[in-house]
Amino acid sequence: MEDDLFQLRHLPVVKFRRTGESSKSEDDNISGEHEIQIGPVQTELEAVELEDGTTVPKEFANPTDDTFMVEDAVEAIGFGKFQWKLSMLTGLAWMADAMEMMILSILAPQLHCEWRLPSWQVALLTSVVFIGMMASSSLWGNVSDQYGRRTGLKISVIWTLYYGILSAFAPVYSWILVLRGLVGFGIGGVPQSVTLYAEFLPMKSRAKCILLIEIFWALGTVFEVLLAIFVMPTLGWRWLLILSALPLMLFAILCFWLPESARYEVLSGNQEKALATLKRIATENGAPMPLGKLIVSRQEDRGKIRDLFSPQFRCTTLLLWFIWFSNAFSYYGLVLLTTELFQAGDVCSISNQRKAVKPKCSLACEYLTVEDYTDLLWTTLSEFPGLLVTLWIIDRVGRKKTMAICFIIFSFSALLLFLCVGRNVLTVFLFIARAFISGGFQAAYVYTPEVYPTATRALGLGTCSGMARVGALITPFIAQVMLESSIYLTVLVYSGCCVLAAVASCFLPIETKGRGLQESSHREWGQEMVGRGTHNVGATPSHSGSQE
């Protein structure tokens, strides 16, 4: 009894308010502590009022109870075996996304020659994939917020696998145009793997882990180029499409293990499922669960686009849309531009060809050579140093400055393409540019899930991904069509766009470095109460203390 009284003396002074009772009273101006009278009368409490007059939700009405939220459990359990498995599984989906994107720069010149396609049809073949992604990104985000992250991810991956294999059997241009568009529709949901992944990560390792999962993207691009080197000269592009679907097939087989996000379960009212998921993670990691009861967050409408434009997120949403647009516009533009530059030999060769009086036939083509594939591989390998640089600076200078630095260095590297240099120096310039634009993309993937609350996290990431696809949709007409008119204007467009993106990064109103994931768009009472001495993390699990 004495211990209980000792604990109560050290708790914040609170006043209990009855249902319907005004929060203002005549005693508000009286200084000193308010006594808590406990009598036999049962009174329904709707809130607790702290000394500063702030109201706490009724689930915290008893300050002596041990309670915890999902964020507290994730922090207590930490990073372990479960997260390593999740990294590998969601990484497969990420790797497949990269391969489907990388295949565009390989497939387009091949079909240009084999089917004698004009340049605008080649550009359209690339753009239709991004049209599908743009149309579906917000939809998959809404599905993930409404029905669960796992559900949205599984459906999108199976969809992509089906139409990806089917497109290998396309007999004519119109068929492959439609089927690749449907592939793009499915790929629009793959970024939700980042949402699912981030919601299982403790705060101190979240940025590093999300960046490290980007290794699968880099591996996917490298694997696609290596696959093309061996498959294209012998088996052709149809087999390349089939073999490129292998990571998706492996994911579809293993996805039965994939758990639903505990944060999503709590927000949707499935407290028991969320608790079961947390216990599963604790068991696999060999870590104790926090003592007490799992607090259910206030249930909110999920997946509502209007929430992205609430006063607290309106500026963030608009700036992020432009940042994601610029990232994809420049990244995929550089991928396509690399192929064009390697085929020409250098920038000056392209410039001289444009000045020639002899008109250029739009059906003229050149197949990619082994040397072209090798140089493409070298620039693709730049994803790794770009990832390492971002990994090193993102927790030192913050997410916003990291994105700004990457955009500025990319812009400078792109301007170096104005110089008339040989193939080797050109490869170095492209290597640096690709390293930093991919680093900026990776930083955006860290920042976006961190800045939005659970109720709109998947939708926020989905709409940003959709805006990225708008940039990717436009970029073939810059990197492939405008290039025929002016290489210098093409490079200037990409460089200027990223300078503006760097400015936008600096003006983002929220820095998420060292910030926990927000469960709600409202004030996070669970996290505040933890610091008041009522939370017991890391204690030995107790059946009597934990909610079953």
Curated annotation (Swiss-Prot):
Keyword field contains Cytoplasm: no
Alphabetized SUPFAM superfamilies for the sequence: MFS general substrate transporter
Residue ranges, Vesicular side: 109-119, 178-180, 231-238, 338-373, 423-424, 479-486
Tree of life domain: Eukaryota
Record-level GO cellular component terms: membrane; synaptic vesicle membrane
Composition bias, Polar residues: 537-548
Protein name stated in the entry: Synaptic vesicle 2-related protein
Source organism: Xenopus laevis
Gene behind the chain: svop
